[in-house]
């Protein structure tokens, strides 16, 4: 089974399974295909978190493929520029090392059965030959073209004559295909060192950022112990911080104390309880989720049923919390 938001990405994952790949191979193939077909949502320039269940050992491992901020971007620099409290959403300082490529390679190397060249074949083919753009993707693509691509270095590679592709139009991305081929041939080193790394650092610096080639060359994924809780006797697993999966576990712990089964799934009463539970969970995640090397969250306390009971008492049956903390 392969499930994504895009049929062509599903087809990429299924193709890999038919070639003898396993879930790890198919997941990376589907992610790469989504990079091609839904570039407004995901891509090799982002991060990668993954949970993998090994049936032979009955163990779950968590891959943290997120990238760090540039080494030179310290608090003093942000304070000097008046940015210590908040960064504008499209500020070049928000650009971190892209961890997805290493995450893909590491997941396939540790748990996959095929080579990266085989795994990236469907996505490379889509990028080279083109694909019909889906309506919702076209909508968000157009928004991005107006806000960012028009002035972004290399933005023309994601537009057609300066505009976003329309729904149903065939779009090709030869530049992304070349990147995939280099990773297929040279592994993650081809992305984090050499021409690609130089281009990434140069573009970020030209935009006013401080990402350097050394930041990319020093990047590594890490394998972590997953975190979990139980919801009505079913155990749920997530990646630990700095992943955001903690919010889902906190929300389920809070929600477990309500008899939502007695409420219609679409009723205002049930939706209210679900929303308020997650608002409290997101508030905790905003406060506690950070780089665990510098600020480790008290996970045992946060995931305890006693803590969930404390948070649950903040949920009112007939009104919303205006600003949960």
Predicted regions and their residues:
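Noncatalytic scaffold domains of N-terminal-nucleophile
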Residues: 1-11, 15, 21-186, 191-193, ...
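Flexible, polar/acidic helix-loop-strand segments at domain edges
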Residues: 246
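Conserved catalytic core of Hanks-type protein kinase domains
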Residues: 254
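Internal maturation/activation junctions in enzymes
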Residues: 257-325
């Amino acid at each position: 089974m392969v499930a994504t938001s895009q049929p062509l990405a599903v087809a990429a994952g299924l193709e890999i399974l038919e070639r003898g790949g396993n879930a790890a191979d198919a997941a990376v193939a589907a992610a790469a295909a989504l990079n091609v077909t839904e570039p407004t949502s995901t891509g090799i320039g982002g991060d990668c978190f993954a949970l993998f269940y090994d049936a032979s050992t009955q163990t779950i491992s968590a891959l943290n493929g997120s990238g760090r901020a540039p080494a030179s971007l310290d608090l003093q620099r942000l304070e000097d520029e008046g940015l210590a409290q908040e960064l504008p959403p499209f500020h070049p300082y928000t650009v971190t090392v892209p961890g997805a490529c290493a995450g893909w390679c590491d997941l396939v190397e540790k748990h996959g059965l095929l080579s990266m060249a085989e795994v990236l074949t469907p996505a490379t083919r889509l990028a080279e030959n083109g694909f019909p753009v889906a309506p919702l993707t076209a909508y968000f693509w157009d928004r991005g073209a107006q806000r960012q691509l028009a002035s972004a270095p290399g933005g023309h590679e994601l537009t057609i004559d300066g505009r976003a592709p329309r729904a149903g139009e065939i779009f090709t991305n030869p530049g992304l295909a070349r990147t995939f081929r280099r990773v297929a041939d040279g592994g993650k080193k081809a992305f984090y060192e050499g021409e690609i790394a130089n281009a990434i650092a140069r573009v970020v610096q030209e935009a006013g950022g401080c990402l350097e080639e050394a930041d990319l060359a020093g990047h590594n994924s890490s394998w972590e112990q997953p975190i979990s809780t139980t919801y009505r006797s079913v155990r749920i697993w997530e990646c630990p911080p700095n992943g955001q999966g903690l919010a889902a576990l906190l929300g389920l712990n809070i929600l477990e104390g309500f008899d939502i089964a007695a409420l219609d799934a679409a009723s205002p009463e049930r939706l209210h309880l679900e929303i308020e539970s997650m608002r409290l969970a997101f508030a905790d995640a905003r406060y506690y989720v950070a780089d665990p090397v510098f600020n480790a969250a008290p996970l045992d306390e946060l995931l305890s049923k006693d803590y969930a009971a404390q948070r649950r008492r903040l949920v009112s049956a007939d009104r919303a919390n205006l600003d949960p903390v």
